[in-house]
Amino acid sequence: MRGLEKQGSCATAAPCGCVQPALEAGNLLTEPIGYLESCFPAKIGTPRQPSICSHSRACLKIRKNIFNNPEHSLMGLEEFSHVWILFVFHKNGHLNYKAKVQPPRLNGAKTGVFSTRSPHRPNAIGLTLAKLEKVEGGAVYLSGVDMIDGTPVLDIKPYIADYDSPQNLSVHNDHHKLRAEAQVDGTANSCDQLLLSGRGKVQPRQSTKERPKCLEDRTSGENSQKSRDMSEIQHTLPEDRERALDLALEPSRGESMDMPENQLGPPELKSFLEEGTDRPRKVEGALVLPGSSAETQWDASYRARTADRVPYSVVPSWVTEAPVAPLQVRFTPHAEMDLRKLNSGDASQPSFKYFHSAEEAKRAIEAVLSADPRSVYRRKLCEDRLFFFTVDTAHVTCWFGDGFAEVVRIKLASESVQVADPEESLAALGS
């Protein structure tokens, strides 16, 4: 017992010798809150990121052995547009992992595992930002997923732009300080009030293809001019709004301003931002002339106070400018006819389980193939081989050329073509 007490936060040992869960030591036994039902039945063809295919759908049902009333745990979640899904990469095939990996996006180049989203990690845990379609009882319906069917889900968390986005986080942390600094003669500046009134209604700008949508769209043209001006201020992008705040605080700095006129807001804000650089201004109740030592000191003080701002997130160039370029996707006439048959509306014909129409299924297939789902090995050594994957009830056969992918056949998943060689050559189809 004394030995265990001296160990402090070390894991406690059971009589069998196994390590018992201990939160303080970081040892815990996770239990899935549910298992995902996804339109992707296998790893092959599943998007590597949730932003690739917005039409992919899934359903998560909370297990009753987690909560007696699963619907109680989801109360209030329907008010959010997007959610974080924490899950387990349960189809890794092995538990081995390396410090350096070769992500397909780098096309063979190596980088550290913690700088990637590789599933082969010390703890095989994944994170996905998915769109919340609806909450029904104890089930959550999602779209824009990159998880396969049967994925164990560990947790659900709401996406909150003010907390999860570096852009909005900067405005959130500084807004009370900026508001206090913009006060003149004890009264808050009108432009400051107008700008801050829109905080919390703007979703951050995303570098990926898909963006979390604003919960409130722009107001229509039939509203009054004042309402339109207020709406424009509220829906200004975070970085533009932060720039407007900066200009409101130091209007005499001779920096160029490329903000569109329709984003400047009401007349009082426009006139404030359009003040000439040769006009005196008030700083903390005192009149300051341009070029004076007082102005220089105030500018230096302002830059020091705002030096820790992070107006946007930064990613390496291989994320935004990957060596693997997007592919053009095309369908043969026979493949398009097969796709229409899968959703013909005839009771005797099979239909999709997740997609709402054949056109939606086609767009999903295009999104998957445009991102080139092949591994680096297949890209380099199997260029003349067919590629197969399944999405929803459609088993897709395609081949890849120079800068394009062509779908040549689509069959019902239960009737997929069986071939002796899984890497059948293109000549087998007579193409």
Swiss-Prot record:
One GO BP annotation of this record: tRNA methylation
EC numbers for this chain: 2.1.1.-
List of residues binding S-adenosyl-L-methionine: P47, R48, Q49, H90, K91, R117, L127, I148, D149, G150, T151
SUPFAM superfamilies: YaeB-like
Reactions listed under catalytic activity: N(6)-L-threonylcarbamoyladenosine(37) in tRNA + S-adenosyl-L-methionine = N(6)-methyl,N(6)-L-threonylcarbamoyladenosine(37) in tRNA + S-adenosyl-L-homocysteine + H(+)
Protein task: S-adenosyl-L-methionine-dependent methyltransferase responsible for the addition of the methyl group in the formation of N6-methyl-N6-threonylcarbamoyladenosine at position 37 (m(6)t(6)A37) of the tRNA anticodon loop of tRNA(Ser)(GCU). The methyl group of m(6)t(6)A37 may improve the efficiency of the tRNA decoding ability. May bind to tRNA.
Organism taxonomic ancestry: Eukaryota, Metazoa, Chordata, Craniata, Vertebrata
Stated family: Belongs to the tRNA methyltransferase O family.
Pfam families membership: TrmO_N (PF01980)
Listed name of the protein: tRNA (adenine(37)-N6)-methyltransferase
Comp. bias intervals (Basic and acidic residues): 207-242
Disulfide bonds: none
PROSITE patterns named in the record: TSAA_1, TSAA_2
The entry's keywords: Methyltransferase, RNA-binding, S-adenosyl-L-methionine, Transferase, tRNA processing
Species name: Mus musculus (Mouse)
GO molecular function: RNA binding; tRNA (L-threonylcarbamoyladenosine(37)-C2) methyltransferase activity
TsaA-like domain boundaries: 30-168
Region entry Disordered, spans: 196-242
InterPro entries linked: TrmO-like_N, UPF0066_cons_site, YaeB-like, YaeB-like_sf, YaeB_N_sf
